[in-house]
Structure formats: structure tokens, C-alpha cells
Design a protein with these regions (language model features):
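Ligand-binding beta-strand-loop-alpha-helix segment within the catalytic cores
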Residues: 77-124, 142, 151-199, 203
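Gly/Ser/Thr-rich loops at beta-strand to alpha-helix junctions
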Residues: 23, 127-138, 160
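Glycine/charged-rich beta-loop-alpha catalytic/anionic-binding loops adjacent to active sites
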Residues: 7-16, 54, 95-101, 149-153, ...
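Generic secondary-structure signature for well-ordered alpha-helical cores
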Residues: 16-19, 35-42, 57-64, 78-86, ...
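Long amphipathic alpha-helical segments
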Residues: 1-94
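Histidine-anchored nucleotide/phosphate-binding helix
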Residues: 134-146, 226
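Conserved phosphate- and dinucleotide-binding cores of soluble alpha/beta proteins
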Residues: 156-320
Length: 320
């Protein structure tokens, strides 16, 4: 088989969280796939086909919670199937490269549209509580700042990797007022019972995956913060690109190494260390997408209308 060194390098970077954020992971995967298909010197259709399928599976399995990546791979698989019958090397490569580049552009364009729609959500002097370190989070809030809206941001540490430490610096560099809160204190502040007498105007979450029923999967503690906001009658907004929808219920809750919790764990002690949790749709006020603002209950119908190919695609486990 042709050399997969560069493919596997991207896979490793995703697993090691050197490449992070759903959008950047998907873009890295489709970029390396199209680049390698152009570079490799395939002799036969079979060689190119086996390289492509193997590479796609490796990239797809790099992270268990990346529906934007999964949906893109489904899109490419749908383009590959007619090519199998042709068994034409040149036609096959052209089809896969075009599909990869088309989806890459789709990611970029839809992300930009979603960020533009967020400008209508944040008001002057709002105090925003946000969680989940993401590229979209940074770009969305910076877009509101460039719109000359003055507001204040509170955020969590995001243990155990402390991703928000970097994000906080990005905001400070952009002259955005930001305060970091320890993870375990965040619900206390949101509930208006804290000694600082803060009133949070809204909670903004950037999530990893969204289910057909409108519930979302996001980094652990998200359930707690959204539950607190819901019972405190504070609106919860989800920043979302519909390309991240878990159409076929492929996404499971990921767990982390127990050593993060207790390196000296006694032999018979069981430890649960979830990396993600699931937020019920009833806790969510609005989902802001590339196609404007929708209710969680309207999610599946919106995806059906805007991305019918996603609805018709095969689940991952049913692919050849």
C-alpha cells in the first residue's frame, strides 16, 4: 500500500489533542486526505481505493465524538460507491479529491455564517457565562467585540487540560473583559446566590455533538451548568454548525483515564471519569446555526431540509 505516514501523523495529532476543536479536526482530516491523494503515485484503482478507505477509517477513528468529521466521511463514501463499479483510477481520484475539497469549503463557509448570526445575540453590558474551549467560541465573541458591543465574559478553567487558560489570554489580548472561575464554583455564580451579586444574562455553550432530539454532548460539567441556568431561568444558547449533527446516533460518551482522578487507585476501586456529558433539550433556549436560530425541537427537520444527503447517508457501522 502507498505511504500513509502523513495520514497517520494527523491521526496522532488529533489523538494527542495537538489538533483540537471540531472544525479544525475535520478540516485537518479532509485537507490531508485530498493532499495525499494528489501526491501518491498509484498504479491501479485497487491500490488507490484501499489507500483511501484505510486512510478515511484511520482519520474517522481518531476521535469518538466528531460528527462533523463523520458526516464528511459519509459524504465522501456516498461519492465513492458509484466509482467502485467503474474501477477507473483517474475518475476515482478526481471524485474523492473533489468531495474532500467541497466538504472542506462547506465547513469554512458554514462556520462563517454561524458566527455572523451570533452578532444578534449578545447585547450591550451583558454578562455572559461560557464553557467549552473552541475556535468558534473565540471567533464568535471577538465578532461581537468588533461590532462595538461592550460586555463581560465569565468562563471555567476546563479541567483537566485547562484549555480556557489559552482562550482567556486571547480575549484579554482583544481587550475583552473576562473573569475565570474554578469549575466547581461556576453553578454557584450562575444561580445568583454568590456573594459577588452577579446576574448572568445568558449561558453560551459550544458543543461537540448534537442529537436528533436536540440534546447535546459536550465537555463534562456542561449538564450541571445548563441545569443550573434552566432552573434559574437564564437562557442557554448553543453555538452550532448543523454539519456536527449526530444523525445516526453514532456518538457515545467518551471516558478519560482513571489516573487523572487517582493515580494510587486501590485494586478493587472502580472510578468513573467521563470526558463528556449530555444536556437535555429542555435546558436549551436556542440553537444558533449557519441557517439562523432554531429551537431544539426543530433540529431534525432543519437538517432534513438543508442537508438531505446527511439524512440518507449510511451509519458508520454499516459502511463497507
Amino acid at each position: 500500500m502507498a505511504d500513509q505516514k502523513n495520514i497517520l501523523s494527523v491521526v496522532k495529532d488529533i489523538k494527542d489533542i495537538k489538533i483540537q476543536w471540531a472544525t479544525d479536526i475535520a478540516k485537518a482530516a479532509f485537507n490531508v486526505l485530498s493532499t495525499e491523494l494528489k501526491k501518491q503515485n498509484f498504479k491501479t484503482f485497487t491500490e488507490a481505493y484501499e489507500f483511501t478507505i484505510s486512510s478515511m477509517k484511520s482519520l474517522e477513528n481518531a476521535r469518538p465524538t466528531e460528527p462533523m468529521l463523520f458526516n464528511g466521511m459519509s459524504y465522501i463514501y456516498s461519492k465513492i460507491e458509484p466509482e467502485i463499479w467503474k474501477s477507473n483510477l483517474k475518475s476515482f481520484l478526481k471524485t474523492v479529491i473533489n468531495a474532500s475539497e467541497t466538504y472542506y469549503k462547506m465547513i469554512t463557509d458554514t462556520a462563517k455564517k454561524a458566527i455572523e448570526n451570533w452578532i444578534w445575540i449578545i447585547n450591550y453590558w451583558d454578562i455572559i457565562f461560557t464553557y467549552c474551549h473552541s475556535n468558534s467560541a473565540v471567533k464568535t465573541i471577538l465578532a461581537n467585540k468588533r461590532n462595538w458591543i461592550d460586555f463581560m465574559v465569565f468562563n471555567w478553567e476546563t479541567r483537566p487540560l485547562y484549555q480556557w487558560h489559552k482562550t482567556a489570554k486571547d480575549f484579554l489580548d482583544a481587550w475583552i473583559k473576562i473573569t475565570m472561575v474554578t469549575d466547581n464554583a461556576a453553578p454557584f455564580i450562575i444561580d445568583d446566590n454568590d456573594p459577588m451579586w452577579l446576574h448572568i444574562n445568558c449561558v453560551i455553550i459550544w458543543c461537540d455533538a448534537i442529537k436528533n432530539d436536540g440534546s447535546i454532548i459536550n465537555k463534562i460539567w456542561s449538564f450541571w451548568i445548563c441545569s443550573t441556568a434552566y432552573h434559574s431561568k437564564i437562557p442557554v444558547y448553543i453555538a452550532w454548525n448543523l454539519l456536527k449533527t449526530d444523525i445516526h446516533n453514532d456518538i457515545n460518551i467518551e471516558t478519560r483515564d482513571f489516573l487523572e482522578v487517582r493515580p494510587d487507585k486501590p485494586e478493587d476501586l472502580e472510578i468513573i471519569n467521563f470526558a463528556f456529558d449530555q444536556i437535555p433539550a429542555k435546558y436549551i433556549t436556542w440553537i444558533i446555526t449557519e441557517f439562523w436560530i432554531i429551537k431544539p425541537s426543530d433540529l431534525k427537520e432543519t437538517v432534513r431540509k438543508k442537508y438531505p444527503r446527511m439524512i440518507k447517508s449510511k451509519p458508520r457501522l454499516e459502511r463497507s
